[in-house]
Amino acid sequence: MPLRARTRSRTARSLAVAATATALAATGLALPFAATATAAPAPAAAPLTSDFDGDGYDDLFVGVPSGTVDGKAKAGYVSVVFGGENGPGPHSVRRITQATVEVPGTPETGDRFGGSVVAAHVDDDKYADLVIGAPGEDIDAKTDAGSVTVLYGTGDGFALANTAARGAKSGDVYGNSLAAADFTGDTDVDLAIGGKDQVVANFNPLAADTRPVMADRMGGRAPVLTTGDFDTDGLPDLALGYYTQNQPYTQSHIRLYGWNKDEGSMANFWNSSNGAANALASGDFNGDGYDDLALGNCREIADENIDDPCGPEQLTKGGGIHIRFGGANGSFGWEQQTFNQDTAGMPGVAETGDGFGDALAVADIDADGHDDLIAGAPGEAIGSAAKAGSVTALKGGEMGLLDPAGAANAGTVAYQQNSPGILGVAQAGDLFGGAVAFGDHNGDGVPDLSVAAPGENSSAGGVWDLPGAKAGGSVVTPNSLGLPASSDPLAYGAVLGK
């Protein structure tokens, strides 16, 4: 769910897994969304979402599917950096592979264990559990069938694990993407699993039992997944985005699926065709109590001439973000907003290749009752450094992420590695903002922002932790964590857990 510092109680939402030149002036990073005298009252802190050891701190977790394990290239692993009073850091780190005692399977070349990761409370205890996709896993003679593993959190970090999904045939690549939520309303967490040309669900992750949600030609690409209550029935729904290319036509889709208790399955209840998105995220950006859907780097990908599926065409330059607002009585999507870096009040300038919205994350940073949106632009140029990358923190308000005049709300700011208080230097190819996520890593009740730069240091990668989504904090890299050398670039942070 979007992480809230303090907010009213609302329907639970789960965050999913989920990913070339412009000039951006250096931006100071004071707390972007300072609370005002009119801020909403603050009843309680949000529950921790990725506290695997139950110590009161959310933990940072990163899939490294290109990692070498026991000499096996791209066998893959997951790096868990435990939170603490000063945030995540090398003080407590766990590297999880298929050679780890608790984990089923064996490291093999090309397994890509850690290809997707998500946190979920599968077994109903106080510890978050780690769900891991391995889309390259071979199952018996079935090549690249893929698998999903649930590793259970304990007071000592992790204990037992079980397989929650196995691909049924070669090329299924189960675990290409993941989302977790209680879709059925039975209080138990369910999993949505992206594979090749299909999405399946497991309504009992304690066993490897999957059921189809949808199947379509996706050209081998991983579907983008997130969750939110878009039909206002009190249950989380599944949002998925994908596009086909020359199979036989090029077309793109956003689809919503909700639980149909009469049929005992997920049912499609809303579609938008020909508007592709590189990222999806849900949140209540206008504070009306209904979940909204953000489509990152939304643009038309279609052979047909469809009018503006992502809003005004000029706002797709450099990457546009399109918001479909929730509402009562089946009115989801009727109200919309679209913006890019050329929108008034937005830091930066929209240029081709920016990738604005390639990564999204949601939290109510200032606890005013309106969710705020973080948008990564990994292709952003900083000065002459192409693809150095940036992130923009967009403040939610009564009208959503724009004010009545159509400008970005006051307090919207940009972050990049040349900004005061941000560690490091913006360099070509860093891809800062390639992935973003929230977690309360220092336990103060305020969402902390994680920003990945998978191209940092010749694609070794790194993750920045910004406490309270402001300047300062720390950086973790493969070198600082003591991760082993790999035959392939690690691109640490490209698969950033939520």
Where are these regions (language model features)?
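Beta-propeller blade termini
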Residues: P43-D58, G63, G114-Y127, G175-F183, ...
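Short glycine/acidic-enriched loop and turn motifs that connect beta-strands
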Residues: S66-G71, G136-A141, Q198-V199, Y243-P248, ...
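A detector of repeated loop/turn-to-beta-strand junctions in beta-rich toroidal repeat architectures
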Residues: A73-Y77, P90, D129, K142-S147, ...
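Extracellular low-complexity, Gly/Ser/Thr-rich intrinsically disordered linkers
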Residues: G355-V362, D368-L373, A393, G429-G468, ...
